[in-house]
UniProtKB/Swiss-Prot annotation:
Any one GO cellular component localisation term in the record: transcription export complex 2
Quaternary structure, from the entry: Component of the nuclear pore complex (NPC)-associated TREX-2 complex (transcription and export complex 2). Component of the SAGA transcription coactivator-HAT complex. Within the SAGA complex, participates in a subcomplex of SAGA called the DUB module (deubiquitination module).
Domain of life: Eukaryota
Protein's name in the database: Transcription and mRNA export factor ENY2
Species annotation: Ciona intestinalis (Transparent sea squirt)
Gene name for this UniProt entry: ENY2
Stored InterPro entries: TF_ENY2 (IPR018783), TF_EnY2_sf (IPR038212)
Length: 104
């Protein structure tokens, strides 16, 4: 049974890698990244993160916070703050891309 989980994980990783390669080769990955940047700016997500970073620096003091500390502390919250509408839009774009690739 342990092999099944390992095999599935390996297949999932191979699938992710193949999809990522297609996204990169077609230029779709850059388009999706740009769309994500725009949507996150539109919804105020970036401003929320800036504010969270400022609060952490204020609480701990500039001398006691590194960029790595900020990234580690902010990343889980940042992911939670991405609006569901943005997640759904990107997921739909990826699905559409994969459907188009399957028809090629």
């Amino acid at each position: 049974m342990a092999d099944y989980g390992s095999d599935k994980k390996s297949r999932d990783n191979q699938m992710r890698s193949a999809i990522n390669q297609q996204l990169v080769e077609t230029g779709e990955r850059e388009k999706l990244k740009e769309l994500l940047r725009v949507r996150l700016a539109e919804c105020g997500w970036r401003d929320q993160l800036k504010q969270l970073c400022k609060e952490i620096v204020r609480e701990r003091g500039l001398e006691h916070v590194s960029v790595d500390d900020l990234v580690q502390d902010i990343t889980p919250k940042a992911r939670q703050l991405v609006p569901d509408t943005v997640k759904k839009e990107l997921l739909q774009k990826i699905r559409n891309f994969l459907a188009q690739q399957a028809n090629v």
